[in-house]
Amino acid sequence: MGNSETSCIWNSEESFFDDYHASRVLPGFAPDSKLRMLLQMADQAEILIAINAADIEKNKVRHDLGITYDEDVLRLIQEFRDKGLYVGSVVITQYSGQSGADQFKTKLEHRDIKVYRHYCIEGYPSNVPLIVSDEGYGKNDYIETTRPLVIITAPGPGSGKMATCLSQLYHENKRGIKAGYAKFETFPIWNLPLKHPVNLAYEAATADLNDVNMIDPYHLEAYGVTTVNYNRDVDIFPVLNAIFEGIYGESPYKSPTDMGVNMAGFCIMDDEACCEASKQEIIRRYYHALNRLAKEEGTSDEVYKINLLMNKAKIDSTMRGVIAPCLERAKVSGGPAAAMELNDGTIVTGKTSSLLGASAALLLNAIKVLGDIPHNIHLIAPSAIEPIQTLK
């Protein structure tokens, strides 16, 4: 690092490009809001992408995009570059000689992308004396950076973003470079109540990770102020504090909440709108969890947890306008059905037939409504569909 001072900002799993969860629960929040903010500091910022070697080895998939984590790293690099942001390097975390990680490293280097490796540390994260030593973080590659603001992001959770930040702080400090660390994530919103629908919606979104929102006891003790954080940050804070003390001599933070730079709670102008949007999101997540369970991608615990969150928010599935019409259409037709709410509030449904699935029928019916086309008009002639059905 050529500068006398650098800052590491740890980004959460939330996306810079398409944070649709935030846009759903905070009406008016653009999916790329964080990217726009970052672009204002583009000349000072450097992107570092972390990926876990184990995720490369097992071809872990981002289900929202249908691509593996290593493919997503390549996508992120191109996305950032297309936006005019500088991607400095990729760090492969928890490396222990995995062949898949070696192949990926070679692929990146052939594209002139710098690659660093961080290794497994025995007893991590509780063995602080070993972690903060030449045999712990000291074994990791020192990541050469050239700009004062380093943003560490990743394809998804468990990629090692926080550990990468702490390792880098250790190495910078050893080189006499003053470096800081902050957490850049939107949820949970620390200055909203624990059971506020926006924060409950975050729990629903992370039901598969078993995240739980809780009062930050360290912040309450230090400042006498009630704030909200999630269990993983609260549980790990004593360890982080000890690591910071090992690096700096003293910790700059008195609580997990202190580590964040989230000001979203101060931007809410219509709390009622956010509450309603968040309740709708919890219901949506409930059905998403049921779908994952049916496809054997999720667990019943995930469904039970979101159902409990619905009880906490005092809501049920009937509060989502498309549910009742969809169930009624399925009951009447005797097969799978689908429903959609248009921008003007109109509910459109579609049923399963010998020619079309429910989703295809729904889309065609929605086009008819939007185009004011009589329902008995065929947008696609049955004779055009039948050969496809025969082929299938």
Residue ranges and their predicted role:
Residues 1-153, 168-327, 342-344:
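Flexible phosphate-sensing "switch/lid" loops adjacent to ATP/NTP-binding sites
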Residues 156-157:
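The conserved Walker
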Residues 164:
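Hydrophobic positions on the alpha1 helix immediately C-terminal to the Walker A/P-loop
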Residues 328-329, 369:
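Amphipathic alpha-helical regulatory segments at dimerization interfaces
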Residues 332-336:
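Short, small/polar residue-rich loop motifs at catalytic or cofactor-binding pockets
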Residues 337-341:
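Cytosolic beta-strand hydrophobic patch enriched in CBS
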Residues 349-392:
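Zn2+-dependent cytidine deaminase-like catalytic core
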